[in-house]
C-alpha cells in the first residue's frame, strides 16, 4: 500500500508576524503520525488570497491537504472561496448550517450579524463537519480526478482539535498506512550533536527501514528513530552500545528527572551551592515530583562574603584566585557537602555577563565542581559566551549531568 502524502496549510498573518506560535501544525503532525500518516510539508500563508496558490501547489504533490484557518465571518477569511477556485465549483448556502448559526447566537442572547451567515456558505460537493466549540464548520472535499482530498478546519485549537478527533480521524482511518511506523526519542547529555553523529550515524543507518534524525537543545541532543518495531529495537541496541553512557534514563525523561531517578536508585542525597545560576540547579531538581527524597540543601552564595560565611570558602583563597576559579568552586562544593550532610554536592561559579569579564576570565567562563562523600572532588571549566539566560541554562545542564556520575559507595569489609 502506497504511503499517503499529506500536506498542511496554516493561514494567519499573526503566525508570520510571530505574534502566535503555530501549535496547530505541531499537534496535527503528531496526531497524524500516530494514525499512520506522515506530513510531508507545512506551509504558512498570510490571511487573504495567498491561500489560493498555496492550495494549488499542495494539490500537485499531496493526496490529502489539510487547511486550518480562514473559515471565519470576516472579509479576510477566504479559505472557502479558495477551495471553490481550486476545485472549480460554486458555493451554496446550506440552510441547515444557517439555522444552526441562528440558534447558536440565540442561545447566547446575542443578535447574529449578517456577516456570520458567510459561514453557512458551502462549496458544492463538500461535506460539513460539525463544530462543537465555535461557529466555523469544517469542510471536506473528496478527492476528484487529479485533485486531492481537501479538509478545511477552523484555526482556533479549541475548535480544531475536537473536530479532528471526532470527525476527521474516523474519516481517515481506512486510508492509513497498514504498517504504521513507530517513533522513539532518546535524549543524550554530555556529548555534542556533531560528535554524536560521528559516533553512531554509520551504524544506525545500517539498520534497514530505520530513519534517524538529530535535534540539538541547550546541553542536550535528541535522537529520533522512526521505523518498525524490529528496526527500532535494532537501532536502540546500537545506540546504547555506542553512546549508552550519554543516554538518559528513563527514556525520554528530562535531565532533572533522570537525576532524581538516579539519585533515588543509588539511595543518595544531593546539595547545591550556586553563584551565577542563582538557584536554577536547585529549582530544576525540586521541580521533579519525589525530589524531597533526594535533595538535602541548596545555597545561593552570590557575594564573596556569603561563600565564606555559609560555605567556609577561605577568604585568602577568594582574594588570591577570585570567585570564578577552580580552588573557590572546589571549596564551595566541599563546604556544601560537609554542611548539608548530603552524599554529593555540586557547585558553580561563573561570569554570566554581559559585563564582568576580563581577558583572563572572559564573559561565559564558569567553573563547576562535584564533591562526593568518600571520594575525590571533580572540577571542570567551561566557556559558554552566550546571553545570560542561555548561559545559566547551559551551566545548570552540565551541573546536573555531573550528578549522574554519583554512585553509592559500598562499605569496605575486612
Swiss-Prot record:
Pfam families: CinA, CinA_KH, MoCF_biosynth
Disulfide bonds: none
PANTHER family attached to this UniProt entry: NICOTINAMIDE-NUCLEOTIDE AMIDOHYDROLASE PNCC, NMN AMIDOHYDROLASE-LIKE PROTEIN YFAY
Family per similarity comment: Belongs to the CinA family.
Record-linked HAMAP family: CinA_B
NCBIfam families per UniProt: cinA_nterm (TIGR00200), molyb_syn (TIGR00177), PncC_domain (TIGR00199), PRK00549.1 (NF001813)
Name the record gives this protein: CinA-like protein
Organism of provenance: Akkermansia muciniphila (strain ATCC BAA-835 / DSM 22959 / JCM 33894 / BCRC 81048 / CCUG 64013 / CIP 107961 / Muc)
Lineage, broadest ranks: Bacteria, Pseudomonadati, Verrucomicrobiota, Verrucomicrobiia, Verrucomicrobiales
